[in-house]
């Protein structure tokens, strides 16, 4: 139970961090299309690529991003902003 709770807390925190990172990168690049790998995002956020891949797939299933090799396209920046708050 404790491990489940810790995972939930870390997951909730990570979704906010990933959303904030994607929005910041889009702002810096001036584009909703980010040419960045899951590995690079993981390195920036201090986590593992597999964790970022799961989170980005979740974002994709919710219609917030579209994933392709070496690229993340932001589709719903408003929802990402809501998520980061």
What is each stretch, according to the model?
Residues 1-13:
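A small-molecule sensor/coupling module
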Residues 14, 23-85:
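Phosphate-/nucleic-acid-contacting segments
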């Amino acid at each position: 139970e404790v491990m489940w709770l810790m995972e939930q807390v870390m997951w909730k925190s990570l979704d906010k961090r990933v959303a904030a990172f994607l929005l910041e990168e889009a702002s810096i690049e001036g584009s909703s299309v980010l040419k960045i790998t899951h590995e690079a995002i993981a390195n920036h956020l201090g986590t593992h690529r597999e964790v970022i891949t799961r989170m980005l797939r979740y974002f994709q299933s919710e219609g917030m991003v579209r994933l392709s090799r070496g690229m993340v396209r932001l589709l719903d920046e408003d929802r990402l902003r809501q998520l980061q708050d």
